[in-house]
Amino acid sequence: MRQLFNKLKWTGAKAYFSYVSRGAAGGEEVASIDDVVEVGSGGVTISTGSGERYIPYHRIVEVRLATGEVLLDRRKR
C-alpha cells in the first residue's frame, strides 16, 4: 500500500481514496491524493480544512484514478 501511495503522489496522478471514518455519514470519507502530505510506514497523513489527519492503511478501502479505474478495492473480499 505504501508503494502505491508513493507512486501516485510522486508521479502527480489524479486519484482518490475512500477510507473508513466513524464520524462520517455512511461510515466512509473520500480524499484526494493531492491532500496527502506524508506517506508513512503504517498510513498516510492528509491535510484537511481543520488541520491534518492520520489515516492508517487498514482503514483505506478503495483507491481509484480520476479516470474511474479502480486500483484497490477491499470491499470485494
Curated annotation (Swiss-Prot):
Signal peptide: none
Classification via InterPro entries: MJ1316, UPF0248
Protein family per UniProt: Belongs to the UPF0248 family.
Name this polypeptide is given: UPF0248 protein Pcal_0252
Source species: Pyrobaculum calidifontis (strain DSM 21063 / JCM 11548 / VA1)
